[in-house]
Amino acid sequence: MYLYIETLKQRLDAINQLRVDRALAAMGPAFQQVYSLLPTLLHYHHPLMPGYLDGNVPSGICFYTPDETQRHYLNELELYRGMTPQDPPKGELPITGVYTMGSTSSVGQSCSSDLDIWVCHQSWLDGEERQLLQRKCSLLESWAASLGVEVSFFLIDENRFRHNESGSLGGEDCGSTQHILLLDEFYRTAVRLAGKRILWSMVPCDEEEHYDDYVMTLYAQGVLTPNEWLDLGGLSSLSAEEYFGASLWQLYKSIDSPYKAVLKTLLLEAYSWEYPNPRLLAKDIKQRLHDGEIVSFGLDPYCMMLERVTEYLTAIEDPTRLDLVRRCFYLKVCEKLSRERACVGWRREVLSQLVSEWGWDDARLTMLDNRANWKIDQVREAHNELLDAMMQSYRNLIRFARRNNLSVSASPQDIGVLTRKLYAAFEALPGKVTLVNPQISPDLSEPNLTFIHVPPGRANRSGWYLYNRAPNMDSIISHQPLEYNRYLNKLVAWAWFNGLLTSRTHLFIKGNGIVDLPKLQEMVADVSHHFPLRLPAPTPKALYSPCEIRHLAIIVNLEYDPTAAFRNKVVHFDFRKLDVFSFGEEQNCLIGSIDLLYRNSWNEVRTLHFNGEQAMIEALKTILGKMHQDAAPPDSVEVFCYSQHLRGLIRTRVQQLVSECIELRLSSTRQETGRFKALRVSGQTWGLFFERLNVSVQKLENAIEFYGAISHNKLHGLSVQVETNQVKLPSVVDGFASEGIIQFFFEETGDEKGFNIYILDESNRAEVYHHCEGSKEELVRDVSRFYSSSHDRFTYGSSFINFNLPQFYQIVKTDGRAQVIPFRTQPINTVPPANQDHDAPLLQQYFS
């Protein structure tokens, strides 16, 4: 037994040293420096060394002995800085060992690979000591980043896996969705940089079910010494629930790094195929180690993963995904075999042998090696292929769950986060911009893009077509468009967010008079300035919460501009009374079309289009409906207006209106659960009612409907905001106006067709309702009850002003002269008619 154990230790040490040498050989000087010095920086703690912080920071790695590189570093510190590192006290040191895991040292390691480091520590560290060690690791991450090396540390309590503890979703330890599978990956890929050897490798595979008993036997026989080994526990059976959660996690990762994740996703699928008795790959590698079969290029974990997936896909006769996984493997290794190299490293030898076995020709190698220059057609083909493979894995996962009557044990929060990211990335919805380049090619930019509009009544669908070439009709006719949509906004967004459209792209447009080149260029500049291409991935917290609008652009009059009709015309209007929503004598709305472009907290990009007289109302309702009342306000809201005339005024007015409505939507509280805003559009009054759960819109034909709607929609504490329309008032009303109070004036029409109502708010802004029918008394009662329910304050946006109850008056005629009396009271002294005409002369604006 002793000789057997010693032989195993020698093999284990030899494999470990081979992996260390390979990790260093594959990388540049900065990586080599970081990789070599990390154990030293964790073993010692000194103000002159990176990672230092005040406090009782745990330091010292069990059985640490500096190698030649580390001794040289320590000697330099002592020689040039006068520092003599103090060895930690003797005995059991706090850090059990330092290990890399993942692709490091394997054929899958590339020049851009990061480092995942497990810092395994004694379970007797208290919370404060663990926190200090975590802070030191964070400082070391920053130090490595300053050298251009990405390092991620994970503190691992040596008893963590025995107690089935899990981290939270978001790190490489991937939350509660993996446990045995995480340990499986660690055992098959770990490289010991310093500290104790890993005990699991010494236990034969046929003793796995009795792991703890076998280990205790080795200790009892004196073959192994307990404090010389890191013992994270055995690999118990894999539960269906854990497989389900781990597979979802791999799909989650595949969104951002598809080539890297496909291989792991298919490994999990292979495990499920063998369920309930899967051959975990770590056990496979250990069996080879015990048998002395150092195959697969030195038991390279990446090659063995490919070998297992190949066995599975061959067995189920799936050549399509087998070809894909081989290409993913080739691209991950990143050795361009079609290009000659002066020095042939071990990774190149491995890949050359595999490619020869696969029967690939030079044309395929050249195509794959040219991946950095792939453009949209190749990228979209690759994206669809990757998506098909991932969805096939997902379907197989669902079948697996049904077959095993699965009750998912992963926490509901983790599953919710995973499924929401899958939904955000893969769900195809109208108006949603599909992002087709998740790290497939670094540059999709096009030198030329042409937008062509096809009007209704033609052979092709009406709408917009995008081509990646200049508008030479021969080339356009002979090529399929890259993308089609009914609305230009969606095409521009698709081209921008997928990287085809850059500042260097030459734009062309055949817009049939709808959109010309200057307008297109202006829109592209606005969108590119407002929306950054790349943002950090959404956090698990964001994915667990309802999606919220983060960046919003409201694009006004891009495709239909009512002000274009003003060209070469004289238009009469009063600047003081100009209302862009009910403009001029005909009360036309100057907003003809609205396009929404927004990015939400799940990093989805969406577009919507509205046109016609009610575009503003519909767009407002849609925007506000996508904001739940507890949502954070958008980070930015921009209005881009492309009107030929009155552009600045329209933009400002829309910006004010949208900001006001967003504030009303998000500022209501449970104590003040509803708010109301009236808006006049194209001569019609619309009411927006802000309730706890939604925003409703109602057309208000007359005062009875207007205030009946208030009464019907109001809840306790309802506040009112009225968008008034400046109109010519009877002189008697104009003269009786008083700032600071709300005034209602009733006037009989004299033709038995109801009555008129003139309403003045505290600022004497007026709104008029003609030919109203119904009970004035009921109206007065409802309005009085409404205002009195608001207590003693009137809310106007976020500011407060003094509140007075409304005053009600009746306009009567005495001796042919109009006068004002309080409603339903005895007449008061006659008020002489105002002798001032407040109407200014009509102004003219000539548009050319």
From Swiss-Prot:
UniProt keyword annotations, A-Z: ATP-binding, cAMP biosynthesis, Cytoplasm, Lyase, Nucleotide-binding, Phosphoprotein
Top-level division of the source organism's lineage: Bacteria
Region Regulatory: start-end pairs: 541-848
Region (Catalytic): 1-535
Phosphohistidine carried by residues: H609
Main subcellular localisation: cytoplasm
Any single biological process term in GO: cAMP biosynthetic process
EC number: 4.6.1.1
Recorded catalytic activity of this chain's protein: ATP = 3',5'-cyclic AMP + diphosphate
GO cellular component: cytoplasm
A matching Pfam family: Adenylate_cycl
Enzyme class: lyase
MF (Gene Ontology): adenylate cyclase activity; ATP binding
Regulation of its function: The regulatory domain is involved in the regulation of cyclase activity by the carbon source. Activated by the PTS system, glucose-specific IIA component (CRR).
Subcellular location: Cytoplasm
Family from the record: Belongs to the adenylyl cyclase class-1 family.
PANTHER family given in the database record: ADENYLATE CYCLASE
Protein name as annotated: Adenylate cyclase
Source organism (scientific name): Salmonella typhimurium (strain LT2 / SGSC1412 / ATCC 700720)
